[in-house]
Amino acid sequence: MPDSELKGFATADGRKLSYRKLGTGPVLVCHPGGPGLSPAYLGDLAGLWTRFTLIILNPRGTGASDRPADPHAYHFDDYTSDLEELRQHLGLEQIMLLGYSHGGVVAQVYAAARPERVRRLVLAVTTARLGPEQQAATQAAIEKRSGQPWFEDANAAGQEEDPETDDQIRDQVFRRMPFNFARFGPAEAAYLDTWRSEPINGDALRVFSEEVPSLDLRSRLANITAPTLVITGLEDYVCGPVCAAELTAAIPGAREVIVADAGHMVVVEQPLSFHDEVAAFLTS
């Protein structure tokens, strides 16, 4: 990974919002997922720094970005407000925007509300909602992994009561993490160890858990005017092909790419495919 700069600025309400800058070329703003997880999980974004100047946001309350005073201020509109402040800070009339997972939901909200500010949009392993069809696909993907040696503990973690402390949340998140991969072995476990000790923001996860049952962006997606790439892993257990198909159908002119042998962590599972598809789209 190349050297990167950790930069930041003060938001209108006095918080510090930080981002990591690396690479050279046209600016690509990336909003990571989680929520509440360290953006370190994205690594160098599949080497896209070789083609673009990456601006990888530390969303509010994660990484080096301040937590808001209100522990409930982690709604999608809060994140999109921060994204707009970042655009203004960068001095860009329009941005190329990549949203990953939860960050992809933020990117949808932003691009639908401010279509004139988005030049190109990449929606990676994300969804417009988690309705019955998406939930059925998730359950089928979970059952498909039932023969794996890690399955029993990972599945049990998802059935437990909501943890109270950030450390307890970290334990639950990482126990369940194998589901995010098409195949989970020593290499994937080693990757998790590279950011396992990063702080987790439980407030952000709790707000998301409360907000996601009513999430449904389908009526807004026609407002998106930017050329859009929807990309996910074939084996993604939470935002897989069912989610991608719905997004692609709802966003005018959107292009869909399904990456084989990849799950929710497609950016680290199949970095070459992810890099090539995203770079080709952004430079076409």
Labelled PLM ranges:
Residues W150-S219, A226:
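Alpha/beta-hydrolase
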Residues G8-H72:
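Conserved HGGG/HGGXW glycine-rich cap/lid loop of the alpha/beta-hydrolase fold
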Residues E93-A137:
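Conserved hydrolase catalytic core segment
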Residues I224, V230-T232:
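Short beta-strand/loop motif that positions the catalytic acidic residue
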Residues A254-S284:
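Catalytic active-site module of serine/aspartate enzymes centered on a nucleophile-bearing elbow/loop
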Residues P59-H102, D276:
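Active-site loop/oxyanion-hole signature of alpha/beta-hydrolase fold enzymes
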Residues L121-E160:
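Flexible "cap/lid" loop of the alpha/beta hydrolase fold
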Residues E235-C239:
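Acidic catalytic loop of the alpha/beta-hydrolase fold
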